[in-house]
Amino acid sequence: MSRSETLFANAQKHIPGGVNSPVRAFKSVGGTPLFFKHAEGAYVTDEDDKRYVDYVGSWGPMILGHSHPDVLDAVRKQLEHGLSYGAPTAMETEMADLVCAIVPSMEMVRMVSSGTEATMSAIRLARGFTGRDSIIKFEGCYHGHSDSLLVKAGSGLLTQGVPSSAGVPAAFAKHTLTLPFNDIAAVEQMLNEVGQDVACIIVEPVAGNMNCVPPAPGFLEGLREQCDKHGVVLIFDEVMTGFRVALGGAQAHYGVTPDLSTFGKIIGGGMPVGCFGGKREIMQHIAPLGPVYQAGTLSGNPLAMAAGLTTLRLISRPGFHAELTDYTTRLLDGLQQRADAAGIPFVTTQAGGMFGLYFSGADDIVTFDDVMGSDADLFKRFFHLMLEGGVYLAPSAFEAGFTSIAHGDAELKLTLDAAERAFAALK
């Protein structure tokens, strides 16, 4: 029995399912989840001392690679001054200034401790600002595990094969209107019917929780136009795309400006951080300035601020995102070539340093139905073959993959060699 198998058996005694986030349980791909004990650069090492090229990156935050020395040094330095104060710090202001400089739509920002907190708070703020109750989200998009957003969500819920979560009251769900992603005509029709009741539209500008689905041409622009027409707050959930698709996020990459944005993952540099922000006239409705309440004991935690500030400064260097995107493109081109050579139906998607892998004969992946039409069983086999070859992919056919600046030619060769063997075995 492997060390991971032993640890997983022990974990299930007191942790539901043996994991603290459902997708980690390997239910979608089968087998025993790997328990990791070390991570450095582009690699993670499991409890049995096997090393893998990592394309999960802690589900997105590790854009610099694991254990970047500058980030570790910043955290060590802060450790000497204390773990948490529950009071304002200079670093919070530095972080707010930097985020607002990088993302021009962010005129004011509030720090929280997770992406879920960020999206939950942004929606409450939009409701308080507009005085309206309903929200629009998109099928397959995941915005955290708050009650009103677990309606036809993506991510772990797609992995489990259920459209929503038990425990969500119907009274909550009735205010959440769900439309097809990349279908601007459906948005226009809905807003023409009930726009006066809609507080906000929340969208992942790149749908990264039903694998990786970029926006169709005109979709984001159409959302902006429709929100302006009906007085609806447009929220970009950039927890995944922020600082990754481009330094300024998907809104910079696609040239569409939201009213509010949410960020997470990279902003914490591996520590638990999220934030939401946007137009000053909206943000001034947050307590203590306004009537919309939001608070958090660990919001702006100094250790997290130290890690996040260092990360954002490092990724701000000229050429960083071009290098990240180039590696990702070479990776996907190499995978496609090897799948084609093996006669395996396969298509990839990309947005900067995030990507999607689909076992599908479709020309492109644009809609939720396109995602669901891919062969999850073939992915399951591919996942385990790649794992045997020393490559760790997301353990679900419905999760995006991530590259880091630590991935280089050696990691690319190892990955493509493993993929060539895996595709051959799938014939």
Swiss-Prot record:
EC number(s) stated in the UniProt entry for this protein: 5.4.3.8
GO process annotations (BP): protoporphyrinogen IX biosynthetic process
GO MF entries: glutamate-1-semialdehyde 2,1-aminomutase activity; pyridoxal phosphate binding; transaminase activity
Post-translational modification N6-(pyridoxal phosphate)lysine, affected residues: 265
Keywords, alphabetical: Cytoplasm, Isomerase, Porphyrin biosynthesis, Pyridoxal phosphate
NCBIfam families reported for this sequence: hemL, PRK00062.1
Cofactors required: pyridoxal 5'-phosphate
Reaction(s) this enzyme catalyzes, per UniProt: (S)-4-amino-5-oxopentanoate = 5-aminolevulinate
Family per similarity comment: Belongs to the class-III pyridoxal-phosphate-dependent aminotransferase family. HemL subfamily.
Pathway note: Porphyrin-containing compound metabolism; protoporphyrin-IX biosynthesis; 5-aminolevulinate from L-glutamyl-tRNA(Glu): step 2/2
Name of this protein: Glutamate-1-semialdehyde 2,1-aminomutase
Cell compartments where the protein resides: Cytoplasm
Species this chain originates from: Pseudomonas fluorescens (strain SBW25)
Signal peptide start-end: none
